[in-house]
Amino acid sequence: MSAFIVLGAQWGDEGKGKMTDYLAENADVVVRFQGGNNAGHTVVVGEKEYKLHLIPSGILYNDKLNVIGNGVVLDPKALFEEINYLESLGVEITPDRLIISDRAHVIMPYHRVLDGIKERARGNKDIGTTGKGIGPSYTDKMERSGIRVCDLIHKEVFEENLKETLEVKNKIITEVFGEEALDYDEIYNEYLGYAEKLRPFVKDISVIVNKKIKDGKEVLFEGAQGTLLDIDYGTYPYVTSSSTIAGGVCIGAGVGPTAITNAVGIAKAYTTRVGKGPFPTELLDSTGDWVREKGHEFGVTTGRARRCGWLDLVILKTSARVSGLTSFAVTKIDTLAGLDTLKVCTGYRLNGEIIDYVPASLEDLAKCKPIYEEFQGWDDSIANARCYKDLPENAIKYLKKIEDFTETKVSIVSVGPKRDQTMIISEI
């Protein structure tokens, strides 16, 4: 394979960082194609733990080119904080190892301010945004009033764009919401500093990535969030503001669909989500609490406790369909060790009918009652498995159910956070 996608098949937090890190060993290029610093990946290498938000997971290898694509919204302040954090851990960040799309849109201070103001204004109908300005930045992109990286590094263009945009934003901030206006000079000077630091990293990434593919290099596209947070196919409006499915690669990295050879969906052996929105298999009991504590289900970016529930195969089937997944990588199957009985959702009961897809209507999804199939559990020895035959028989049956229901093979299984606790069980 020369170009393949790794993306979340649920509501995010599936272990994409670990899987990308694992698969990046054989890749030449790792590309982040959407989202912003609202995403959080945790990667464990040896005894060290790395928390990534913007920079692709391939940065932990010395011989990979890492790319932030045009589909990403870039907060320069957050980027350089992450670079400083990684360098403090001994990871070298240079323009030879990291490049940034000149077409990526820039998150500005007014995006963060408006994100917080609007979320507070929603009251008990809040969406659960991270408050990092992601949505407002994508809004400006669609309204054609955003500032791109290529604009930021051209002083005169940035000066003109900032004046025009800030005038409008300050009217909204002061006249609509009654908050204090932002200072032009303060923003201008701060971001000019970022521009000079960014300049060496800025490239036309579409040209570079497509040439790598043409030259037969291995290119891995790393998604953030998950399918059920996709702006079109997620549980709208409790979604992110970008396209998290496989199709997002084409617009977020500037490659054609025929360039993609494989798409791997990352799925936990159970289901989690952060924030509000329907969750058919949610466990609101001691079992849910047990899974949360054992699985350390707290957000990397926000620290918020994740809601936990049984594995929902309807969601995985939907993910396989909308992204054309060629296989699944199943993570955290070790977390379920110790439970005598496990449940797996194989359908929803809605208005007297049984369905096997995620309905578009939020109201309909909230009415869906999960239909469960039960499986026998396994013990903690699963964490010591290093190949398929080492897995407990009941775990193998569990994985087989995923394959049969979704009509998509399981190619990778993870039984712990470390690199050596990952096994490839079939061709990716």
UniProtKB/Swiss-Prot annotation:
Localization in the cell: Cytoplasm
Superkingdom of origin: Bacteria
List of residues binding substrate: V300, T301, T302, G303, R304, A305, R306
GO biological process entries: 'de novo' AMP biosynthetic process; IMP metabolic process
Alphabetized InterPro entries for the sequence: Adenylosuccin_syn_GTP-bd (IPR018220), Adenylosuccin_syn_Lys_AS (IPR033128), Adenylosuccinate_synth_dom1 (IPR042109), Adenylosuccinate_synth_dom2 (IPR042110), Adenylosuccinate_synth_dom3 (IPR042111), Adenylosuccinate_synthetase (IPR001114), P-loop_NTPase (IPR027417)
Catalytic activity from the UniProt record: IMP + L-aspartate + GTP = N(6)-(1,2-dicarboxyethyl)-AMP + GDP + phosphate + 2 H(+)
Cofactor: Mg(2+)
Pathways involved: Purine metabolism; AMP biosynthesis via de novo pathway; AMP from IMP: step 1/2
PANTHER family per the UniProt record, alphabetical: ADENYLOSUCCINATE SYNTHETASE
Name the record gives this protein: Adenylosuccinate synthetase
